[in-house]
């Protein structure tokens, strides 16, 4: 049986057009076009962001996308901005969800040591096809990344089913902090710095996210592989690719498996 899996940081629904708009319908169109069986989403929310005000409605992006596209879903908030705007990771799946939970990654002791900080989470869901999916978004602070890697490893070691790990890890493959993760689960790209997944628009985002880039790597090149799909040995990789789209500041990363 074939299985198409996708991870996509949706940038709070804000696209990369010349005049950016908050457009979850654009995200929906990308997902519809690619038609994955399982989708991990990061930066899902409707809070105020950059020049975009919060949506003062009952609109919940994960639920909206799931209903629009016909998927089962689970939303795992990492934080709740202003006590009313949940923000975090989401799972869309064609398979019913048997169980799901949100695991908060322990905060670093020093929350401002070398960059922007916010609490992060890991979504853990067991599907009725026998696969457990983890969806996450690591931070940019060193200790935060270390905590995240350790937390993911502990979760994976407890899981008895085949596993997928989908996420924006805010690290390139050569980052030493990632090494322990490679020892317990297989990276689809085998540690290669490709395909590049961020940013979509190099000229636009290098300036805007210079601080983030410095935390990802000391290197000065712009396009980076920071989005990942990891898998357990039961899943065989058939193909991997990204597509060009301005629906977000990240490119969707797609992997087709044989199971």
Q: Which sequence ranges carry the predicted segments?
A:
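N-terminal, active-site-proximal structural segment of metallo-dependent hydrolase catalytic domains
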Residues: 1-68, 73-75, 80-85, 150, ...
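Beta-strand-turn-beta hairpins that frame and shape the catalytic cleft
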Residues: 1-6, 85-89, 93-98, 117-135, ...
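Active-site beta-strand/loop signature of hydrolases that rely on acidic residues for catalysis
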Residues: 4-10, 27-53, 92, 132-136, ...
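Short, solvent-exposed loop/turn segments at secondary-structure junctions
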Residues: 10-13, 45-46, 80-81, 95-97, ...
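Soluble or luminal CAZymes and related metallo-dependent hydrolases
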Residues: 19-26, 57-61, 115-119, 144-151, ...
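Active site of divalent-metal-dependent phosphoester/diester hydrolases
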Residues: 20, 55-57, 71-93, 110, ...
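Short glycine/proline-enriched coil/turn segments at helix->beta-strand junctions
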Residues: 35-36, 69-71, 93-96, 127-131, ...
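Catalytic-adjacent loop/helix segments of enzymes that bind and process anionic phosphate/sulfate esters
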Residues: 99-151
């Amino acid at each position: 049986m074939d299985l198409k899996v996708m991870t996509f940081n949706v940038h709070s629904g804000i696209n990369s057009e010349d005049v950016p708009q908050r457009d979850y319908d654009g995200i929906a169109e990308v997902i519809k076009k690619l038609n994955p069986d399982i989708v991990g989403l990061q930066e899902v929310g409707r809070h105020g962001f950059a020049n975009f005000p919060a949506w003062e409605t009952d609109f919940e992006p994960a639920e909206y996308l799931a209903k629009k596209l016909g998927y089962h879903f689970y939303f795992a908030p990492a934080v709740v901005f202003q006590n009313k705007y949940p923000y975090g990771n989401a799972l869309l799946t064609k398979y019913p969800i048997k169980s799901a939970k949100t695991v908060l990654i322990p905060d670093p002791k020093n929350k401002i040591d070398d960059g922007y900080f916010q609490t992060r989470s890991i979504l853990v869901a067991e599907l009725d096809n026998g696969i457990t999916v983890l969806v996450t978004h690591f931070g940019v602070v060193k200790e935060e990344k270390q905590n995240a890697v350790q937390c993911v490893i502990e979760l994976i070691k407890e899981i008895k089913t085949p596993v997928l790990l989908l996420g924006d890890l805010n690290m390139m493959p050569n980052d030493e902090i990632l090494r322990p993760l490679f020892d317990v689960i297989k990276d689809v790209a085998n540690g290669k710095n490709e395909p590049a997944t961020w940013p979509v628009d190099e000229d636009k985002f290098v300036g805007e996210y210079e601080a983030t880039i410095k935390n990802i790597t000391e290197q000065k090149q712009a396009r980076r592989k920071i989005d990942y799909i990891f898998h357990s040995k039961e899943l065989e990789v058939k193909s991997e690719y990204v597509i060009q789209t301005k629906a977000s500041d990240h490119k969707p990363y797609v992997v087709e498996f044989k199971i």
